Design a protein with these regions (language model features):
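Short, surface-exposed acidic
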Residues: 156-160, 263-274, 311-318
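Secondary-structure end/capping motifs
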Residues: 226-307
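Pocket-lining segment of extracytoplasmic ligand-binding domains
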Residues: 87, 168-171, 175-261
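Surface-exposed patches in mature extracellular/periplasmic domains of secreted proteins
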Residues: 100-102, 161, 246-257, 316
Length: 326
């Protein structure tokens, strides 16, 4: 009899422990847009701190496929991806529109612009006249350069376009093969500083506020969001904690990033200085991390429409939501 009672008690304890274990962790696939860098620090912080695990989530971070990060999300093979407002705009309209919604902005402002060797007269857009610009031949890219040059009294048609996909801005500028390159200052601009390369630089948004579009951003799949709203909120709450930590603790956050991506350790000074720079950009003047201003978002889409850059016009209010942010 005692043995039977002991067996019953053991089974009861096992069932209690199983129940206390809660439901199984949900797996989230998060697709980067580039190899790990300081734009991605928040997700690695949230992973290292166990904040996703606390939320009942198992998060797998993966590299983007050749077709781009958003494609995996649109096809339902991933739940979230990093991309940019200008990149997803064409994917949101037309017969083959992708079911994507932007759920957070990683940075509050567009930190991209044009870099050139110091003292060559390209510290403003008009100065690009008569110089060689490295282009990847995108209509939106060229319209952006044309816009800032016009705002500065310059003529885009006087720029020599050199087809070139630059991956090492420092080497490209040192080689003299091109004079000007579109960069994101938080990484490539800092890389020039670390290399001791004297440069001139201007931000697009300083010459036309409509070009202060959101980049990078985080997108999700419309159908998945509709079916999993609480999971989306839990994921973004944990991710927000990661970026808030990175904003307040740049050195510690940089260390976490380099532990997750050891290949970055050979450029530790770049990582630390980039992280310090972006610490002020993750939240900046917004009320919270991830917030998207409808007017600024819609203003950029209107600009794309007005410049004939979309085959099918965009609704200025489409493609984003703040409802899943904490």
């Amino acid at each position: 009899m005692k043995k039977v009672l002991a067996l019953i008690l053991a089974l009861a304890m096992l069932l209690t422990l199983t129940a206390c274990g809660g439901k199984e962790e949900e797996t989230i696939t998060f697709v980067l847009d580039w190899p790990p860098n300081t734009n991605h620090t928040g997700i690695y912080v949230a992973l290292q701190k166990g904040w996703f695990e606390e939320a009942g989530l198992k998060v797998d971070v993966v590299q983007p496929p050749e077709g781009g990060s958003a494609l995996l999300v649109a096809s339902g093979k991933a739940q979230f991806a990093v991309t940019a407002q200008d990149s997803i705009a064409p994917a949101l309209t037309g017969e083959n529109a992708m079911p994507l919604t932007t759920v957070a902005a990683i940075l509050q402002h567009n930190t991209s612009g044009i870099v050139s060797p110091a003292g060559e007269g390209m510290d403003t857009p008009k100065g690009l006249e008569g110089h060689r610009y490295a282009t990847w031949d995108s209509p939106v890219e060229k319209a952006t350069i044309r816009q800032v040059m016009a705002a500065d009294g310059g003529d885009f048609d006087k720029v020599e376009l050199i087809p070139s996909t630059v991956t090492d801005e420092v080497s490209a500028l040192k080689s003299g093969d091109v004079d000007a390159i579109w960069i994101f200052y938080g990484w490539a601009g800092i890389a020039c500083e670390v290399a001791g390369l004297p440069i001139d630089y201007f931000d697009f948004a300083d010459f036309d506020p409509v070009l202060d579009f959101y980049t990078p951003i985080i997108v999700s799949n419309n159908d998945w969001l509709a079916s999993n709203p609480e999971t989306a909120k839990a994921f973004l709450a944990a991710l927000s904690r990661g970026y808030e930590y990175a904003a307040e603790n740049p050195k510690e956050a940089a260390d976490i990033l380099m532990e997750a991506a050891p290949e970055l350790k050979s450029n530790a000074e770049l990582v630390y200085r980039s992280q310090e720079y972006l610490a002020g950009e993750y939240i900046a003047d917004a009320a919270r991390w991830g917030e998207i201003d409808p007017d600024r978002w819609g203003g950029y889409f209107t600009w794309l429409n007005d410049n004939g850059l979309m085959e099918t016009p965009l609704d200025p209010g489409m493609g984003f939501t703040n409802e899943y942010l904490p």
